[in-house]
């Protein structure tokens, strides 16, 4: 199985991006459903619970981003060694990735448990919403190791093109989460904390399944033997030169989201926060197919870069961008046309029904950026594929902080358009930055092809 996956990555780049993207897409949509499922069940707890957990969202984005980012570092490193046909280095990269996941889990758990309350207060949480946020966040952060290993180890499988088994582990996890959520929240009476506990238990199962394949069953392309492990700083650096910037991608987005929430809270208080975070759940769900395409681009570009094939690098990026635009357009149409119906998913009680019109407006305005975001996403992940994680981070900063935070402040605060201005700023900032990102990626690829001579 593993060798077939490797051959797909080394073959036709358009076919490879498409074949790899579909299972990643399913995995990511299922992973995003954690947030959706939690939101549906938590909606029954009232506006304070929705807002409180909404305040945790930026912090959750950071910890989830670290796990995905470190997984991206593993994917990039392993795929480049696979392209260069260096099996030993690919296996060493996988072993070093596991060590990095362990260290990150311990450090981040301690940091987030200490900082969660000050951060929630900074976002504007107080009273019951602050209590609900802490109640949800504490067990979530205690189980951080599960997220790190589940997402990180998936990155190892993706580095060798084994996307399907990464998807299977997620399927088990999501089904378990859907079963445990109502039990932990309502039957056991744990409320907000129950949603977090259900998510953590599900992630633990996902991590166990993937680590079993890699460490026990040993039927992967990479051959990890922890008993023979020897630390090699050059391999660790190769992983981290993509993994750290990729992790910081989500940190940057979390910082940007924190600023959006400060703007929104100053305009409309808990009502605005509840509307935004409910709509944001759907936006994050909708963007998963675009992220999946980008992740496939990382693996294929990494393999092509390792093989020094400039033509395949160019074709993989261009196809990924087109694929992303098509998916982004389809998703946008669904969100705009069915905005009202989708909004009621998170506001189905008498207490939260008044949120529906504003969630609807968010979906119909903020999500208009998705088609162009598809091209931008493929471009951001292209840089991870060639091992230039810092440039990938640079474009995330341009998109989320410079363009989008600037646009939301300009339209929402400076011009005084209120929440509609915030929603418009989200769409305009992200769309404009994505266009520039794509153009710069094409310029970079032109230089790579000239250097490689193909």
What are these regions (language model features)?
Residues 50-110, 147-166, 261, 275-339, ...:
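Small-residue-rich hydrophobic transmembrane alpha-helices
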Residues 62-65, 109, 177-182, 207-211, ...:
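Hydrophobic transmembrane alpha-helices of multi-pass small-molecule transporters
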Residues 19-35, 139, 150, 173, ...:
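Transmembrane helical elements of multi-pass membrane transporters/channels
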Residues 29, 33-51, 120-127, 183-190, ...:
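Helix-terminus/linker motif at the lipid-water interface of multi-pass membrane proteins
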Residues 1-21, 78-145, 187-243, 301-369, ...:
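Short alpha-helical transmembrane segments in multi-pass integral membrane proteins
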Residues 47-58, 133, 137, 196, ...:
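Small-residue hotspots at the loop-to-helix junctions and early N-terminal turns
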């Amino acid at each position: 199985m593993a060798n077939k996956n490797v051959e797909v990555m080394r073959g036709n780049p358009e076919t490879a991006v498409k074949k790899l993207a579909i299972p990643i897409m399913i995995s990511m949509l299922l992973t995003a459903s954690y947030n959706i499922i939690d939101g549906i069940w938590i909606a029954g707890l009232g506006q304070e619970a929705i807002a409180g957990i909404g305040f945790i969202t930026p912090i959750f984005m950071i910890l989830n981003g670290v796990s995905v980012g470190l997984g991206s570092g593993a994917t990039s490193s392993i795929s480049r060694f696979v392209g260069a046909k260096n099996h030993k280095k690919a296996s060493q990269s996988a072993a070093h990735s596991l060590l990095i996941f362990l260290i990150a889990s311990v450090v981040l758990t301690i940091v987030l448990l200490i900082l969660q309350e000050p951060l929630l207060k900074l976002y504007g949480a107080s009273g019951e919403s602050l209590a609900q946020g802490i109640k949800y966040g504490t067990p979530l952060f205690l189980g951080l190791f599960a997220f790190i290993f589940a997402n990180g180890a998936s990155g190892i499988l993706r580095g060798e093109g084994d996307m399907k088994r990464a998807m299977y582990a997620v399927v088990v996890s999501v089904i378990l989460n859907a079963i445990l959520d109502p039990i932990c929240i309502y039957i056991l009476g744990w409320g907000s904390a129950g949603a977090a506990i259900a998510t953590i238990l599900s992630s633990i199962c996902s991590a166990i399944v993937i680590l079993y394949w890699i460490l026990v069953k040993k039927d992967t392309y990479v051959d990890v033997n922890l008993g023979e492990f020897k630390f090699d700083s050059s391999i660790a650096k190769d992983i981290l030169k993509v993994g750290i910037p990729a992790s910081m991608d989500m940190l940057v987005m979390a910082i940007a989201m924190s600023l959006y929430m400060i703007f929104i809270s100053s305009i409309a208080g808990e009502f605005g926060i509840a509307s935004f975070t409910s709509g944001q759940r759907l936006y994050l769900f909708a963007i998963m197919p675009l992220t999946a395409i980008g992740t496939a681009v990382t693996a294929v570009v990494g393999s092509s870069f390792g093989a020094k094939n400039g033509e395949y690098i160019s074709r993989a990026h261009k196809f990924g961008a087109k694929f992303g635009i098509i998916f982004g357009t389809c998703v946008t149409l669904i969100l705009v046309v069915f905005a009202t119906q989708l909004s009621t998913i998170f506001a189905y009680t008498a207490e939260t029904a008044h949120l529906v019109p504003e969630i609807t407006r968010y979906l119909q305005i903020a999500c208009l950026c998705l088609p162009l975001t598809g091209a931008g996403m493929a471009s951001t992940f292209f840089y991870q594929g060639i091992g230039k994680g810092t440039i990938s981070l640079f474009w995330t900063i341009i998109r989320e902080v410079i363009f989008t935070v600037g646009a939301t402040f300009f339209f929402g605060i400076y011009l005084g358009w209120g929440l509609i201005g915030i929603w418009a700023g989200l769409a305009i900032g992200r769309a404009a930055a994505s266009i520039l990102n794509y153009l710069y990626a094409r310029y970079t690829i032109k230089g790579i092809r000239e250097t490689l001579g193909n």
